[in-house]
């Protein structure tokens, strides 16, 4: 087990192995200690009075140097002291960089890396913004550490896939001055066109090198939306020509956006993210206004605090979120987090944001959802109505022989015949197959009843074969009007006990024939159509017979 090393102005991170120091002199290595610093190799490029924190590229370079020292066989049993000068700014940068290293590389938790820094005297200096006004808002090492840790937990930072060469190349102005903040967002300074004639160029061949670099990178990295927050310094057609949608959400430099702009931005960004694309956002410098909107989305999506969000953004792109925008983000951080649960992405696109979908309240979302359901129901009903109109059958022309009677008794017409009327068959039947005597099959024509035949020319054959079913065939086969027959009770009784002779139909058989034709029409074709009374067959089943009881 390694033993502790006690040195003045030194903080122990890992017992006997990793220490943080601050000295006004250059310490010399011993048999037990190895000292190193990066102040002469890694520099923070300040905008004004800002001095840190160091960015992710600085951390990557620091990690490479640190690992070389730790893995040197000569240092296997020595404690390694990472130190800085005694300057308050340098102490803060060194401590913050070592803490972020332990979070990202060694997978320490925030409380593990912050515990050694607690109660340090003098305390570490907080970081300020890149603006020119007095620093009235500060973030601490703790804010940066928690911001980096949360980004790591949410999959926004991965040093294993980090490309140092690309990062350092594109952060330079001559290559576009942009940084990939997260897998979904790119922050960049506004491209500018050289237009000495007073108009914006429309051909990309006349663009300067930074603009061309931006266009090439965006086209090759699935950027689907560019959001402009400043006044026009280029023609948006350059982005649209390569298939990138362009959106203007302009507000004044150095000011804070209205919440309606934020909702439009968050909704538009969510729309693009769900499509699998990236969003590139810029203002004049790509720092203040850009940081406001991207920061609001990070808080909305991942639950950052305002300070954590600012710390993380500056860790990726130094200088982001300036002046009063820091206070604005702090004051509205709870609003942005609540939006995750109190708002929804609109179901209707907004022309104000180029046909994308803004963020709306739950109440408005419910109304939209209800209206869409109602509209869908109405449209479905209209379609069904149109289909019914197309497939509706014409009304009956009254000539069908198989139409049902208005009553159980035949009505007496002026011509003295019995007329049967029904709407059971909506259109004229083409004729039904019938079984005839001696196994012969015929087609009964039941359509032509315009010229009814006389009673003398009609012949109704009712036959009882060996089967239990009876068949009836109209040998003349056309008219559904029968002559009026006077009948008595005894006649009906006699007709029910004997077969009909001389082809003279009785009223009972006429009624049975009409019932039989109606049953034949209404019953499914695969059923056996029978008529007459019910009786028990030899097998014990019930059968209908025509006119008489089968013995």
Curated annotation (Swiss-Prot):
Regions of compositional bias (Polar residues) in chain numbering: 404-455, 505-514
Domain of life: Eukaryota
GO molecular function: phosphoprotein phosphatase activity; protein serine/threonine phosphatase activity; protein tyrosine phosphatase activity
Subcellular location: Nucleus, Nucleolus; Cytoplasm; Bud neck
Key words of the record: Cell cycle, Cell division, Cytoplasm, Hydrolase, Meiosis, Mitosis, Nucleus, Phosphoprotein, Protein phosphatase
Residue numbers of Phosphoserine PTMs: 467
Outcome (variant: residue 253 to A): Inactivates catalytic activity and leads to substrate retention
Enzyme class: hydrolase
PROSITE patterns per UniProt: TYR_PHOSPHATASE_1 (PS00383), TYR_PHOSPHATASE_2 (PS50056), TYR_PHOSPHATASE_DUAL (PS50054)
Segments forming domain Tyrosine-protein phosphatase: 190-342
Pfam families: DSPc, DSPn
EC number: 3.1.3.48
General remark: Present with 8550 molecules/cell in log phase SD medium.
The organism's taxonomic lineage, starting at the top: Eukaryota, Fungi, Dikarya, Ascomycota, Saccharomycotina
Keyword Nucleotide-binding (UniProt): no
Protein role: Protein phosphatase which antagonizes mitotic cyclin-dependent kinase CDC28, the inactivation of which is essential for exit from mitosis. To access its substrates, is released from nucleolar sequestration during mitosis. Plays an essential in coordinating the nuclear division cycle with cytokinesis through the cytokinesis checkpoint. Involved in chromosome segregation, where it is required for meiosis I spindle dissambly as well as for establishing two consecutive chromosome segregation phases.
Variation of activity with pH: Optimum pH is 6.9.
Listed name of the protein: Tyrosine-protein phosphatase CDC14
InterPro entries xref list: CDC14_C, DSPn, Dual-sp_phosphatase_cat-dom, Prot-tyrosine_phosphatase-like, PTP, Tyr_Pase_AS, Tyr_Pase_cat, Tyr_Pase_dom
Keyword Lipid metabolism: no
Main localisation: nucleus
Cross-referenced Gene3D superfamilies: Protein tyrosine phosphatase superfamily (3.90.190.10)
CC terms in the record's Gene Ontology section: cellular bud neck; cytoplasm; mitotic spindle; mitotic spindle pole body; new mitotic spindle pole body; nucleolus; nucleus; RENT complex
Active-site residue list: 283 (phosphocysteine intermediate)
Family listed: Belongs to the protein-tyrosine phosphatase family. Non-receptor class CDC14 subfamily.
